[in-house]
Amino acid sequence: KVVDLGSNSLHAENDKKEYVYKVSDYDYNLTKNYHDKGIHRYEINEAVLLADVVINIPKPKTHRLAGITGAMKNFVGITYEKASLPHRAIGDKESGTGDAYDKKSILKMYMEYIDNRQTICSVKGQIVMAKLLDFLKKSLYILGVLFSGDKYRIGSWYGNDTIWRTVVDLNHIVRYANKEGNICDLPQREILNIGDMIICGEKEGPVGPSPKP
């Protein structure tokens, strides 16, 4: 079910900046259908909306975009359409066009464009072209680092101002969206968070974390 937070979304604070949001391995035009000026929609699993109680069992670990995955970040799993989850804003922090990387760089700007073209080719099954674009993308990234000294990309750094807003939006939906997906003033269900912290994850999370007892 689609839940539209509209002006209640924390992303609405950046509407005037006209960000273009991106999710890795998804065409940014898909995400634009969910998040644009005045529109902030999320595809939410109806089972969550129909529940009276939600039991949330996260595995705490580091996260290269969000910093940490815990009880709040774990609610990213309530959506069945990842394209509706903004992870970064295309562009650089320095000029205010986005938060995917820090310093302004024409090379990285082209890298972002090629990254999206690669995604489209992969979806269409154009594997050879996708591999060529991947090589070109990585080459531009290396050149971008050499010229700007900025090693960051795809929002994977401490200056990411997008993913935390997505996380808070989803937590707001879990707490206040009723069974029809409408946002109410009062909480609509109870939430129990139980962290599985026997072994956590540190360093290169969330994909390749090191065990932390």
Segments (PLM) and residue ranges:
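Extended, low-polarity segments enriched in aliphatic/aromatic residues
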Residues: 1-213
